[in-house]
């Protein structure tokens, strides 16, 4: 990857590059690895924590930050101080890539504007949907107006799904929007990793249908809807015992409400793939993701999926064929879908098989190349003077 006979230089700004092992951070680290392998130079600017969740890829410049109260794993960057601006000027990036619309991202965006550097943003989270989970729904309007200003000030936006790309095209202009989807590691997530002896070791009988929650245990993942669906299924006479894979500050909250759930905590690698493939149905009530990584990984593992009918899921799941989409925020709808799949094992298995086949099309090599094409479009517009003013 070259420009004017030298390596392309990219400055990536992240609110949390490796403090938490979530889908956004894993995607960004994969992207940096991909870019470096192709000869680009990448410099990452991000808050850092004393304890990281995984070894990060690339050179990280620590940005001054403070811990978010009650969520110490996340940090809030304190803007773009002079030392960081000097480092950025010395690196002289050809592109500034913003992965979050936070204070750091907005400060970097303004600096890039003043310096004449093209700005690319990638969408990873629907932050406006978080507010209702923390009693701040009244702030959604101001938040959406801020996000509109942020994305409208970008030269190019990488949307994770076609529905979101269409939404953003209507807001910010279709010529500035392209898709950066996500891939799945088929060696890590595959139906062949299902392990009946592992299920027995957790106390599950062969005939039991095991519903799975897979992801960070935080309220904004829809834990209240998951709990409601399980309790409704039990009230209907099915003593389902969910399997919970993941860790987070809401673990105790969920454990108190679902005392017979089996909590495996945080897993990685083959242990994670085995746990996912050994369940039967993924229930994903989250409406906050921009891309449903857990949906894709569970699909690759051969599970039937019950997911909220939101843009992050509807682009992956062909409802009735590779999974089931249900009205968001309706525990009753999730419970009804779960009960249908418990009653019809042939349909449940057919959904899982079709989902696993569909996941074959989601390859990291191809999705990461989408980012490079987005960079190229942005640079071409900058060269012809058709970028943002």
Features from the language model and the residues they span:
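Nucleotide-activated donor-binding/catalytic signature segment of Leloir-type glycosyltransferases, i.e.
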Residues: 251-271
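Conserved donor-binding/catalytic core segment of Leloir-type glycosyltransferases
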Residues: 204-221, 227-231
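Aromatic "clamp/platform" in nucleotide-sugar-dependent glycosyltransferases that forms part
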Residues: 287
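Carbohydrate-associated surface elements
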Residues: 48, 163, 183
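Conserved acidic donor-binding segment of nucleotide-sugar-dependent glycosyltransferases
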Residues: 319-320, 324-331, 340-346
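Short hydrophobic beta-strand element within catalytic cores of glycosyltransferases
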Residues: 304-307, 317
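N-terminal subdomain of nucleotide-sugar transferases
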Residues: 1-64
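Short alpha-helical donor nucleotide-sugar binding micro-motif in glycosyltransferases
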Residues: 88, 266, 274-279
């Amino acid at each position: 990857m070259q420009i004017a006979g030298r390596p392309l230089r990219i400055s990536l700004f992240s609110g949390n590059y490796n403090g938490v092992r979530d889908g956004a951070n894993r995607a960004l680290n994969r992207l940096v690895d991909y870019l470096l392998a192709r000869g680009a130079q990448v410099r990452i600017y991000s808050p850092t924590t004393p304890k990281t969740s995984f070894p990060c890829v690339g050179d990280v410049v620590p940005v001054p930050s403070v811990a978010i109260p009650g969520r110490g794993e996340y940090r809030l960057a304190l803007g773009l101080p002079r030392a960081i601006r000097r480092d950025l000027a010395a690196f002289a990036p050809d592109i500034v890539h913003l992965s979050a619309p936070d204070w750091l991202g907005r400060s970097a965006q303004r600096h890039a504007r003043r310096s004449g550097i093209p700005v690319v943003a990638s969408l990873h989270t629907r932050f406006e949907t978080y507010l209702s989970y923390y009693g701040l729904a009244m702030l959604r309007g101001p938040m959406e107006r801020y996000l509109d200003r942020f994305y409208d000030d970008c030269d190019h936006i990488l949307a994770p799904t076609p529905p979101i790309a269409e939404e953003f095209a209507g807001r910010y202009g279709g010529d500035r929007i392209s898709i950066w989807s996500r891939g799945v590691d088929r060696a890590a997530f595959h139906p062949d990793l299902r392990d009946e002896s592992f299920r027995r070791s957790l106390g599950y009988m062969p005939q039991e249908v095991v519903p799975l929650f897979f992801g960070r245990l935080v309220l904004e993942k829809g834990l209240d809807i998951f709990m409601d669906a399980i309790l409704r299924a039990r009230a209907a006479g099915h003593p389902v015992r969910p399997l919970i894979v993941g860790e987070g500050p809401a673990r105790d909250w969920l454990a108190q409400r679902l005392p017979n759930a089996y909590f495996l905590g945080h897993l990685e690698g083959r242990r994670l793939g085995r746990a996912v493939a050994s369940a039967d149905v993924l229930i994903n009530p989250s409406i906050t993701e921009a891309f449903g990584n857990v949906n894709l990984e569970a699909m690759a593992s051969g599970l039937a999926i019950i997911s909220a009918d939101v843009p992050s899921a509807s682009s992956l799941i062909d409802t009735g064929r590779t999974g089931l989409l249900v009205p968001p925020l309706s525990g009753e709808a999730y419970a009804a879908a779960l009960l249908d799949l418990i009653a019809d094992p042939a349909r449940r298995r057919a959904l899982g098989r079709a989902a696993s086949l569909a996941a074959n099309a989601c390859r990291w090599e191809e999705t990461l190349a989408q980012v490079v094409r987005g960079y190229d479009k942005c640079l071409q517009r900058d060269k012809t003077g058709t970028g943002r003013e």
